[in-house]
């Protein structure tokens, strides 16, 4: 199955090729967890790889556009100022040492192997939100403003993301999630949708009214809107600001990106 994309996304891919100085090779891959993923070149590689899953739908356009946004922001920074957020053994151990006692309360509910999987999933989920959501806010604003042909697909994707976020407010999710994970994840969801709600002029955070997340979330949303510097350096600063506010500073590290 060949990859067919709308013209706006084709334009973005060309911008990535021009900005990075390397071509993008599209490769069908059946076992992808999402419909598309761009793997930027390692030091000695000659081309970026755009993996896509057979049977994709129109949402692939937004997924690829979003990833192009991340790459362009990274490469717009001077080479010696490009950094990638990473999780490693050290950051994972910091998380486990902090959360071990809280995770232990689930020992009577699940078998040890399932708890191990859940502990990793909780960690990966929060770090993904923390390191992706702040730049995603700026990328989504930019895509909405600059690529109107993508707008309807973008909004459908964000509505789907919002529905998943709202589902995490349920009592069942609360019951089977460590307190800190539940709290910081919902605060980050609130901030993301609050800032975009204001930009898109939509009502996206009504389900959070009456929850405890609106208090810390409102303060962090205000900080995000007022203080965000719209570039890669600003992305790093805002991710660090979120991490500081949410007490997640040891759960990830920055690594210099080498081309």
Please tell me what each predicted stretch does.
Residues 1-44, 56-57, 78, 125, ...:
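Auxiliary, metal-adjacent structural segments of Zn-dependent hydrolase domains
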Residues 6, 111-112, 136, 230-231:
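Helix N-terminus capping/helix-initiation residues
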Residues 48-64:
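Short pre-active-site segment immediately N-terminal to the catalytic Zn-binding motif
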Residues 59, 106-120, 181-195:
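Short, surface-exposed, charge-dense and proline/glycine-enriched linear segments
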Residues 63, 67-75:
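Catalytic glutamate of the conserved HExxH
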Residues 73-124:
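Post-HEXXH active-site segment of zinc metalloproteases
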Residues 126-139:
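Solvent-exposed aromatic/hydrophobic patches embedded in short alpha-helical segments
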Residues 138-259:
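Pan-zinc metallopeptidase signature
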């Amino acid at each position: 199955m060949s990859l067919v994309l709308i013209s706006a996304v084709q334009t973005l891919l060309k911008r990535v090729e021009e900005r990075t100085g390397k071509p993008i090779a599209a490769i069908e891959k059946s076992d992808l967890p999402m419909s598309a993923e761009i793997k930027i070149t390692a030091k000695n590689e000659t081309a970026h790889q755009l993996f896509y899953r057979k049977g994709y739908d129109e949402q692939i356009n937004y997924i690829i556009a979003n990833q192009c946004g991340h790459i362009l922001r990274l490469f717009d920074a001077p080479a010696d100022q490009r950094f990638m957020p990473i999780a490693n053994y050290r950051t994972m151990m910091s998380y486990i040492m902090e959360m071990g006692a809280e995770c232990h309360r689930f020992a009577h509910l699940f078998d040890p192997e399932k708890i191990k999987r859940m502990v990793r999933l909780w960690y990966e989920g929060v770090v993904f939100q923390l390191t992706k959501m702040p730049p995603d806010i700026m990328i989504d604003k930019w895509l909405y403003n600059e690529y109107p042909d993508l707008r309807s697909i973008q909004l459908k994707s964000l509505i789907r993301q919002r529905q998943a976020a709202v589902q995490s407010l349920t009592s069942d999710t609360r019951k089977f999630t460590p307190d800190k994970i539940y709290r910081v994840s919902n605060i980050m969801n609130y901030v993301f949708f609050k800032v975009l709600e204001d930009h898109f002029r939509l009502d996206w955070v009504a389900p959070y009214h009456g929850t405890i997340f609106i208090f810390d979330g409102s303060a962090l949303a205000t900080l995000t809107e007022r203080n965000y510097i719209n570039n890669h350096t600003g992305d790093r600063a805002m991710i660090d600001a979120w991490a500081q506010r949410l007490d997640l500073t040891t759960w990830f590290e920055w690594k210099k990106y080498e081309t």
